[in-house]
Amino acid sequence: MQTLHVNGYDMAYLDVGQSAGNGLPLVCVHGSLCDFRIWSSVLGPLTRKHRVIAPSLRHFFPDHWDGIGDTYSTAQHVDDVIAFIEKLDTRPVDLMGHSRGGNICFRVAQRRPDLLRKLILAEPGGELDATLDPAYKPGPSPLAGMIAASAETIAEGDIDGGLQIFLDALEGPGTWRRLPATPKQMLRDNATTLIGQMRDQRPLLSKADAEAIRHRRSSSAAPSPRERSRRCCMRWQPT
């Protein structure tokens, strides 16, 4: 593990595959409740052709954040990823984001396309506005309510109870109970970040946002509602 001092914060990251002579840097950005460890199972395949650089976003493991303050937000994480890439010894980079990390990477590509060679969105998170979703209705989304219920339980000190609310609502009843010990511990290590996510005012994804992305891009198959975000992003991005 290494660190880069980014926007007043020491961002921890893994840098794997450089010794193999790989010339294509791939920066991997994790999603909610995760950290750089989430990529462990795919480092082998990825490092066959890439130098993989996987940061942990601000306030995620190995940091143990108390949930206090206003320094956890999508905007802050976008700023941090941009500054992180700027400090690397090689660029442009391929940028891959999973879930909430996909949303962050999408915003990075909007703001700083000069830093990127390719954008990969894996099950990207984010809510769609009326220009992309005819069924859009203003107001809090069901996801926001789920995050709030989970975060409030975590803030009261019931880490496992809060994580169970989140996982079971997102993936189905019994998901938390069935989860193996290792991924459970990673979620516990990052549980307080849901307190910050509850307060995050993440902007909706729009048709104009997607049309602004000009770089080569790729995206994985994803379940609803992430599938809608993925398809809309791909549909409206110019070739």
What are the functions of these language-model segments?
Residues A122-E156:
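A catalytic-pocket lid/entrance helix-loop region that shapes and gates access to the active site
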Residues A155-I195:
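Conserved alpha/beta-hydrolase catalytic His-Asp/Glu region
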Residues Y9-D70, F84, R91:
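Conserved HGGG/HGGXW glycine-rich cap/lid loop of the alpha/beta-hydrolase fold
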Residues A169, T193-D209, R226:
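Active-site nucleophile elbow and catalytic-triad environment of alpha/beta-hydrolase enzymes
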Residues A75-V93:
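Conserved acidic catalytic loop of the alpha/beta-hydrolase fold
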Residues R91-D133:
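Conserved hydrolase catalytic core segment
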Residues M1-D10:
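N-terminal cap/lid segment of alpha/beta-hydrolase-fold proteins
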Residues G44, K207-T239:
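Conserved loop-alpha-helix segment in the C-terminal half of the alpha/beta-hydrolase fold
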